[in-house]
């Protein structure tokens, strides 16, 4: 149903602005083998979504990815705290989670022939939501943002990076997330 609803929205947007880009939004849970109404794996959803859209006529959709750190409360995504967290973030298409450390997993996956656009191009990828807590200091938060930007800028298939918040959200501070810059 989602793919069909997406196509309807896509067609409505394109009818008003032929140059608009329309994205499917996915979070950092790439391949955790979840199957419930409350959670899904981004890779499984992407596979099914693409399969349905191709079968019914390929359109030019893109991916809006949210590569938050694991756990969300740890800003140093390049240096995960425990073996457990490190086991979730691998340089493999079978990784459980995708953060900025391994964001290339998504862009590499989209280079597969079945995901290419009708013109043979890799689909647009934007990092439409990410952020790092300042709970460990603003210098650590700034380093995380700068490093994330460096990774994004050096991946030719990432078209944009958007930070989650300009100011801290009161509801998130209690959870250890001070994502405002």
For the regions a language model picked out, list residue spans one by one:
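Noncatalytic carbohydrate-binding groove/subsite architecture in carbohydrate-active enzymes
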Residues: 2-139
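Aromatic-rich peripheral "rim/lid" segments of glycoside hydrolase catalytic domains that contact
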Residues: 137-181
